[in-house]
Amino acid sequence: MGEDPRQALEVDVLFVGGGPANLAGALRLTPLVAHHNQGVSRGGGAGRMLELQIALIEKGRDVGAHAVSGAMFDPVALEELLPDYQNRGFPLSQRVSRHDFRYLTTEGGVRIPHVLLPWARRQGRCYLGSLQKLNLWLAEQVEAAGVYVFNETCGVEILYDKARMCGVRTGDKGVEAGGGKKANYEPGTDICAKVTVFGEGPYGTLSEDLIHRFELRDGRPPQSYALGVKELIRVEHAGAPGVAIHTIGYPLGPRVFGGGFCYGLDDHHVAVGMVCGLDWDDPQMDVQAQLQRLKKHPYIQRFIKGGTVVAYGAKTLPEGGYFAGAPPLRGRGDACRRLGRIAERAVSEGHPLCDEERDAGGRDDL
């Protein structure tokens, strides 16, 4: 028997993944198109009027469903995207009131002066809070701007037209664990796009397929990764709202790259986590066990003593050396800013969305 017929959906721009970076890219693209059209209508802009269909697919039940609470967010990118974000129900309210960077020893530690860490001075602008709530709020702003957001929709295969990528096939629904079809079976959709933006995370299945197919890593240093584990702890006593702690040293040895963090999200919730580079050579190394040791340190205990773990999670992270990885301890804001600028280039620098000379059926990727 042949394949069940699949529906095809034509869009101009497809974002794969509902993380902060992709949401920011989609949010940035819509006003850029409006600005472009205004310029064309007034005779002061080049090109043609654009009427873009923009879509974003997210595999989770809701955007943010796979995010673990407890993150530091720099609003600098959001101020560029939505200058009035505070009037739109922005879900984070806890500003960083105190930021410490500490080198921990077995029982104590020393505070590293901010004069040695110039980038740390900006942390007072940051917010602490739930990444899940932030993503969900960003998705609401994106939908309000006219972007189609499809939850519970997983990209399983990249579509190619000869040597060019032309979209993504989504996964079938209503499939049994053994592969059989349930009564509610529904074949996936072929979403065809002129521009596709992959924001799947550090080791996305589709992104890796694209990288291997077009040999994007050839001649480049291998990508390094880290593993992060995090717990959200509820404390009965007054916690330390606004306190952001980053640590190096204990419990990690000199041969393991990484560190810990402790964020006071509100009066009764503290996020504690540990991030370790995945290049360790100790077969007994266990990041979760290292997190438990960090939690027992006297300095961390003052924030979480007597608390109860109410949520936990783990995730791989891309690493890029000191200059790319250490300063931005507020990565969600940086990711938003970078993807927003990529979206801007997509409109302004000759991608097929704006190129009158190219075949309308042309495809491109970012």
Set out the residue ranges of the language-model regions.
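Glycine-rich Rossmann-fold phosphate-binding loop(s) that bind the pyrophosphate
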Residues: 18-20, 59, 131
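Active-site-proximal substrate-binding core of FAD-dependent oxidoreductases
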Residues: 43-51, 341-347, 359-366
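FAD/FMN-dependent oxidoreductases across multiple families
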Residues: 256, 282-353, 357
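Predominantly flavin-linked oxidoreductase catalytic cores and closely associated redox partners
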Residues: 31, 48-50, 132, 136-137, ...
